[in-house]
């Protein structure tokens, strides 16, 4: 299952595609988002609501960084 997310920051928009896997790990989810924020140099807030849902029965794995649009 693929999910598209669009995050807005003060430097522009970050669009990415995620694939969900039946693995439970909220810590892994948090690590993925914080790593993405560092790699993209965008101050992205970790989507805790997504991570909390993911911790129930899904893990989020970044498979494709579609685009980074800067202002």
UniProtKB/Swiss-Prot annotation:
It comes from Dictyostelium discoideum. It is found in: Membrane. Keywords: Membrane, Transmembrane, Transmembrane helix. Its main location: membrane. It is a single-pass membrane protein. The keyword Transmembrane applies. The chain crosses the membrane at residues 12-34. The lineage of its organism: Eukaryota, Amoebozoa, Evosea, Eumycetozoa, Dictyostelia. One of its GO terms (cellular component) is membrane. This is Uncharacterized transmembrane protein DDB_G0284989.
């Amino acid at each position: 299952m693929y999910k598209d997310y669009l995050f807005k920051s003060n430097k522009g928009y970050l669009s990415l595609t995620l694939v969900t896997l039946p693995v439970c790990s909220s810590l892994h989810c948090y690590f993925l988002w914080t790593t993405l924020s560092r790699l993209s140099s965008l101050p992205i807030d970790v989507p805790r609501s997504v991570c909390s849902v993911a911790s129930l029965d899904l893990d989020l794995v970044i498979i494709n960084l579609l685009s980074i649009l800067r202002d």
